[in-house]
Design a protein with these regions (language model features):
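Membrane-proximal helix-turn-helix segments that form the acceptor-binding/catalytic region
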Residues: 235-243
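Intrinsically disordered, low-complexity terminal segments enriched in Ser/Thr
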Residues: 1, 6-14, 334
Length: 401
């Protein structure tokens, strides 16, 4: 109140009532915030994909087309060193390296599943190509890397190369390899399974100098314009991943291919072992029981998967021996005590890992949710030899109905 002359002014302040947000309004607000964050994440991810696409086939980049594969491979080593990824690759990743023509992805998937079943922490898997989303190439503990982690690693790799190192981005697959090393390093990967992209000797994944174990899956004629037009030449390129004093395993090969692998083994100075084959009834190739009373029912269909699963078993055993993994070694020793005469020891953890293996797009059956009469049979192949087992798998399922 204030007096002015003969008038008295009275000021009345009306305080607003405290605003009360209804619980439903709070939920709606939080949902809107989440939707906004998700939309932003999707937009950021799409931007990454657009930038990544520029590295395909030298698109929008001034890269000389006459740079040899050897020179590109040497340069990639420089990227690994300059990005400070060498220590992780050689010391922390405990890599399993797999080359071959047929069954590389399936073999790697079997390895991943068996390792996870044996409680190995932070198992990384680098494969190619992807089926739907590029993040499928970077699996951590059986799942594709998250979009947020992908985005962070992508921009770190790209900006470090361009802005700090003042170097050009490598082409698509090589860039993805560097990106993968960053992703797996940040995830604290303790075992990194590397699937060769093409060939072996000059493949980006062959930047690893000290893997724990290497392998060559079934060989055939593929990429003859790059690798050579005979099985001997192709086998020689695939065997380029062999390392001195690192045990190498191979699936059974035709004599011509085996001769090249043996020759490379002598040149490098390593041991080469043909993987012993397990039968789906739980026996090895000599009829000895491999552990457990139940049959080994592989998670991937097709009789040819026995070859890939057998190779994966050998790789995991050798990996455990080289890394001194107590859990796996204990399982193997326990099984040996139960079956001292068995030549091929297959603990229950290995059997369960083989059974749980999943690899989208490989002998996969998808039934339409909206139609009971529509079923999709999915498989992939890039050579005539690879198409044959896929066709046999499809025929077996259809004829069984």
């Amino acid at each position: 109140m204030r007096r002015k002359g003969k008038y008295i002014y009275i000021y009345i302040y009306i305080m607003p009532e405290p605003v009360s947000i209804h619980q439903n309004d709070k939920v709606l607000f939080l949902r809107e915030e989440e939707d906004h964050a998700q939309n932003q994440l999707e937009a950021d991810y799409e931007k990454c994909l657009n930038e990544l696409a520029k590295t395909i086939s030298g698109k929008n980049r001034n890269v000389s087309g006459d740079i040899s594969w050897e020179d590109q491979f040497k340069t990639l080593h420089e990227y690994v060193d300059e990005l400070n990824l060498r220590h992780f690759l050689e010391t922390q990743s405990n890599a399993i390296h797999v080359a071959g023509t047929k069954g590389k992805g399936s073999t790697c998937a079997f390895c991943e599943s068996v390792l996870l079943e044996n409680k190995v922490k932070n198992v990384g898997l680098f494969t190619s190509p992807h089926l739907v989303d590029v993040r499928e190439r970077f699996r951590i503990n059986g799942e594709p890397v998250g979009k947020r982690e992908f985005i962070e690693a992508f921009w770190w790799t790209k900006t470090t190369i361009e802005n700090e190192l003042k170097m050009e981005l490598p082409a698509y697959f090589r860039f993805l390899f560097l990106l993968g090393l960053k992703i797996f390093k940040d995830a604290g990967t303790e075992c990194l399974i590397l699937e060769v992209g093409l060939g072996g000797r000059l493949d980006a994944t062959n930047c690893v100098r000290e893997p724990k174990v290497v392998a060559v899956t079934s060989l055939g004629l593929d990429h003859v314009e790059v690798l050579g037009d005979t099985i001997e030449k192709i086998a020689w390129e695939k065997a380029g991943i062999f390392k001195n004093k690192t045990r190498a395993f191979t699936s059974p090969q035709v004599p011509e291919a085996m001769k090249s692998l043996e020759r490379k083994k002598e040149e490098v100075g390593c041991e080469l072992v043909v993987a012993r084959q397990i039968d789906l009834d739980g026996n090895d190739e000599d009829g000895n029981n491999t552990g457990g009373e139940e049959k080994v029912e592989l998670g991937l269909s097709g009789p040819h998967q026995r070859i890939n699963a057998s190779l994966a078993v050998e790789l995991v055993k050798e990996w455990a021996r080289k890394t001194k993994h107590r859990g796996i070694l204990a399982e193997l020793e326990k099984e040996r005590e139960k079956k001292p005469e068995a030549k091929l020891v297959l603990p229950d953890t290995f059997r369960r890992g083989l059974e749980k293996t999943r690899w989208p797009g490989r002998e996969q059956i998808v039934r339409d949710e909206h139609s009971k009469n529509l079923t999709f049979y999915l498989d992939g192949a890039h050579t005539e030899e690879s198409m044959r087992p896929g066709a046999e798998w499809f025929s077996a399922h259809v004829n069984a109905k």
